[in-house]
């Protein structure tokens, strides 16, 4: 289910429903986590999300285990998407944006989001060519960003 541009209250109701269906309680700590994701364009590791919450809302009493459990639940419910970053683990973002792909710098970890209608069309053509019903995809391109390229003099 794609949740493009949902208003926060609609997103929160969906979140509460998913928690109920998963046999979990709605808590203020979980809402703080959802609100933090909603109001940010950052791709978070569980640890960086935890630190962001602790810094922004020190009285929220959110534990790292709650962050991990809630992110897993949100990912299963397709409310967040994750990017696999090899040994660095996963980074998460809320799924309420229009579809986009990612370029990930292998040096600094910078993530650049992009949209390209030609790539999207080509993927559909390839799927049709193989009689494959495309329901979604996640594209991650790895390389070296321009900042790191200038610093290390690596040729792209």
Swiss-Prot record:
Annotated compartments: Cytoplasm
Official protein name in the record: Ferric uptake regulation protein
An individual GO BP term: negative regulation of siderophore biosynthetic process
Pfam families tied to this protein: FUR
DNA-binding among keywords: yes
InterPro entries named among the record's database cross-references: FUR, Fur_C, WH-like_DNA-bd_sf, WH_DNA-bd_sf
Similarity field: Belongs to the Fur family.
Region called DNA-binding, residue ranges: 1-96
Organism expressing this protein natively: Campylobacter upsaliensis
Major localization listed first in the record, in broad terms: cytoplasm
Gene3D superfamilies linked to this entry: 3.30.1490.190, Winged helix-like DNA-binding domain superfamily/Winged helix DNA-binding domain
The keyword Transmembrane helix appears for this protein: no
Positions bound to Zn(2+): 43, 93, 102, 105, 108, 113
Keywords (A to Z) from UniProt: Cytoplasm, DNA-binding, Iron, Metal-binding, Repressor, Transcription, Transcription regulation, Zinc
Cellular component GO terms held in the UniProt record: cytosol
Chain spans, region Dimerization: 97-156
Physiological role: Acts as a global negative controlling element, employing Fe(2+) as a cofactor to bind the operator of the repressed genes.
Lineage: superkingdom: Bacteria
GO molecular-function terms, A-Z: DNA-binding transcription factor activity; transcription cis-regulatory region binding; zinc ion binding
Residues reported to bind Fe cation: 99, 101, 120, 137
Oligomeric and partner information: Homodimer.
């Amino acid at each position: 289910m794609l949740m493009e541009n949902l208003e926060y209250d609609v997103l929160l109701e969906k979140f509460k429903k998913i928690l109920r269906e998963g046999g979990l309680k709605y808590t203020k700590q979980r809402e703080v986590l959802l609100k933090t994701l909603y109001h940010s364009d950052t791709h978070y590791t569980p640890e960086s999300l935890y630190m962001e919450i602790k810094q922004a809302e020190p009285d929220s009493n959110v534990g790292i285990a709650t962050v991990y459990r809630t992110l897993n639940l949100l990912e299963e419910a397709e409310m967040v998407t994750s990017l696999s970053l090899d040994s660095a683990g996963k980074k998460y973002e809320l799924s309420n944006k229009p579809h986009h792909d990612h370029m990930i710098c292998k040096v600094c970890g910078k993530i650049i989001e992009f949209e390209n209608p030609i790539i999207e069309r080509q993927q559909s053509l390839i799927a049709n060519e193989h009689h494959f019903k495309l329901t979604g995809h996640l594209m991650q391109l790895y390389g070296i960003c321009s900042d790191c390229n200038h610093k290390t003099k690596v040729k792209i």
